[in-house]
Amino acid sequence: MVAEMPWLWLRPASQALGPLVQWQGGSLISTALDQGRGLVLLTPHLGCFEVCAQAIAERFGQRTRLTAMYRPARQAWLRQLEESARARPGLATAPAALAGVRQMMRALRRGEAVGLLPDQVPPQGMGVWAPFFGQPAYTMTLATRLVQQTGAALLLIWAQRLPGGQGFVLRVSPPSQPLPSAAADDAALQQACASALNQEMALLIRQAPSQYLWGYHRYKQPRRVHAVTGDEAAP
């Protein structure tokens, strides 16, 4: 990943990924976009997750803009680098904050696509504890709330690295099971959805466990910030 990042971030926008990317299941994205109800794309910290957004923007940028959520760096210089590096045709970025959540909601209601990493640990109050590989992990509720509140389609995607620097395979798939849609109350529903989401991420990771970013502190305690509620996120 260290070797990939400079090339992905610093190459000219005119230099396409081209033959470095193979697609499996790309037609699922086309079908979802045809429905016109918005599309939520989820990828864990698996493979070259940075290439997913760029590849989607290159292939589908004429049809939709992809808004990808990211956590801004604390250092100003790095934050500026991230923003400039990710500013590419067909691709917008949304900070992991209230403004970014609203930005993604608006994009979905326009029928556009959004992307985020659902195994990223959210701030306290924006997730629930749910099993992940048999251990409790604080899991975001935003990903499934976006689907629930907008009626958007949901797909999973990850970029598998090929050996010898041959490129990547973008693997797109639907969830193995529909998300839970009924429960005793909203808290129970979000708990069930978080558990289902973690199961989906685990299924992807088992396809190539050596390519998962195990060094990411998935089981850490959430940081304390103001929690975003569903009412606040509504534009």
Labelled PLM ranges:
Residues 40-44, 56, 67-73, 140:
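Short beta-strand->loop
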Residues 1-43, 48, 80-83, 88-90:
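Membrane-anchoring hydrophobic helices of lipid-metabolizing enzymes
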Residues 64, 68-103, 114:
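Short, conserved active-site entrance elements at the starts or edges of catalytic domains
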Residues 36-38, 63-65, 111:
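A general structural motif
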Residues 33, 58, 98-235:
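Non-catalytic C-terminal accessory region of glycerolipid acyltransferases
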Residues 48-61:
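Histidine-anchored nucleotide/phosphate-binding helix
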Residues 19-22, 75, 94-98, 136-137, ...:
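A conditional alpha-helix N-cap/helix-loop micro-motif detector
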Residues 44-48, 72-74, 160-165:
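Short glycine-enriched loops at secondary-structure junctions
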